[in-house]
Amino acid sequence: MKTANCPSCGAMLTFRSAVSILTVCNYCKSTLIRHDLALENVGKMAELLPDPSPIQIGAEGIYRKTRFTVVGRIQLRYGQGLWNEWHVLFENQRSGWLGETLGNYTITSLIQPPEPLPAFPELRAGQNLTLRGRAFQITNIETAHCIAGEGELPIRVGAGYDAPVVDLQATSNVFATLDYSEAPPLVFIGEQVRFDDLKLTRLREALPAGWEPDAGIKAQSFQCPGCGSALTVRAKGYTETLACGACGSIIDITDANFRILSKFKTQVTHEPIIPLGAHGTLENAEYETISYLRRAATVEDVDYEWSEYLLLNRTQGFRWLVEYNGHWSLVQTTTEPAQVTGYGAQGRAFHQGRNYQHFQTAKAKISYVLGEFYWRVKVGERCEISDYIDPPRQLSLERTSKEIIWSLANYVEPDLIKAAFRLEQSLPVRSGVAPNQPSPYTAQRPKFRRLLWLFLGLLIIGQIATLALSSDQRVHQQTFVFDAAAKDKALTSEPFAVSGRDSNLFIRAETNLDNNWIYLDLALIERETGASYAISREINYYQGVDEGEKWSEGDAGDEAALSDIPAGIYYLSVEGELPPSSPTVTCTFTLFRDVPSWINFFLALLGLLIAPLLLSWRARAFEGARWAESDYGPSGKGEPEEDND
């Protein structure tokens, strides 16, 4: 650490980092270039634009178990709004950068260019580059404009200089920036980080005057230069443009005179379900609704339109709340690109350990805007959107000529939206199935599976017990001879005893039929009470030789069952009917008591399978309704590949 006095005002200056070559005096705002111990005053530094960043010089944090201190900042403006690069000094004296853009944070360090890089005009969004043997994808190409700097910095900066920059992403949240303001380009590599993971302390306690501490949003009112309507800016420092709902003017908020950038005309005025300025708590963070837009896409001459609400939290940044046909999703951009494989129905996107299936690709345009936006929004602005789903998540890729943006959406139940924003009016009724709507039947499968195994186990145990307890006792056997010419066709068996609990009684008949039939009327009669259990059976058996091949039809034997027969003394009454010219037929009847049966087991098993089969059918119907809206529905390009996972 070195100290020196400001040559302009005499204030004490401290250089904490050995690589710092520039400092801005905190008192007189002189820009001072360091030449060993001498300081050269190169003029006044421009004023920083006020913003709601919670970070300030002197803030401390931890990254990968190493402490760091914020010692300087460069503030830039690019197409998406304000961008802060905080110069940080680690306790091991290593220098790095904490990037802050729209609530997204990165930690990067300057490295030597690993290989010659393409010229800036040659680069395109979506193009792949290899840095240090790792594959990166270009996600954004911008020319940023420096607003001002503060604190100590390792490079010379000043208001107004242009910085052509290229952002690149790789897997595992690895992030890189190419700065073409110098030759050869400066290369910064690091990773995306979460604000909470940095464990930052000594943050800005007092926000600029008028900012609300809870939401971190300042409300500023002015009159629309197009129609005079009262307008409110809730996110100054983030907001680039504001759309007036009264006249359709899109206003440049960064301009002191609130210059009108464009106007749009619409015959339909949309009223947001969630009012602008409404606060709501989602995923344990409080957000304020600052804008609303409508997007539209036309697929096979069918128009689809949906609503998007822009939410802001001071530390968590921006989120999008998307509503389509009464379905809601909370969306966050991600700096980690997905690995895309296959095309069409076989298209897959792998991201952070999850496998997403391609759902649809369409060209969308902004059809209506209201409120404030962090970029220069314009009605008619177009992009191509590809959606991949793994309910309840949806991974989306938005592509323009200058950038590609990956975002992750989580399905949110409408009741949670209504409660989060304390809405009194009813929300739109859900229609159809959303791409990332979780199937209620899929969620029930584990429960049904557990119950199925439980009842199947009980059923098997019950059947085993039935088999073990059944006596399968032969109680009587007797042979009868039936004559077609006999006048008295009724025959009666000798009495026999049936003992034990109420149970079944099987009657088995074995005959000497050969190319013949017999019709039997059987009656099991209890001798004391006269209780009768009747049953009729027909037995037939035919055989022969046809063109040298033997054939047969029917069976010479038969079996019938009577259920719930109580104990007692019984006899069997049998009456047989034969063809008029039939020879005599011998029939032996054998009666078995308490015979183990499988019929009830299989009927119960069939009953058990009805519920899961019904569940599976309803789950397939639900998925069919989901995919009917995709590129692979009835009017789409084909059927999606079935996922058996």
Regions found by a protein language model. Name each.
Residues M1-S503, L578-D645:
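Mixed-charge, low-complexity intrinsically disordered regions
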Residues I74, L293, T511-L513, L524-E526, ...:
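A mature extracytoplasmic/lumenal domain signature
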Residues W86, Y309, D546-E547, E559-I569, ...:
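Low-complexity, Ser/Thr/Pro-rich intrinsically disordered linker/stalk segments at domain junctions
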Residues A490-S493, D502-F506, A534, G557-E559, ...:
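Intrinsic-disorder/low-complexity, polar/charged segments enriched in Ser/Thr/Lys/Arg/Asp/Glu/Gln
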Residues W517-G554:
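Surface-exposed beta-strand/loop patches in noncatalytic accessory domains
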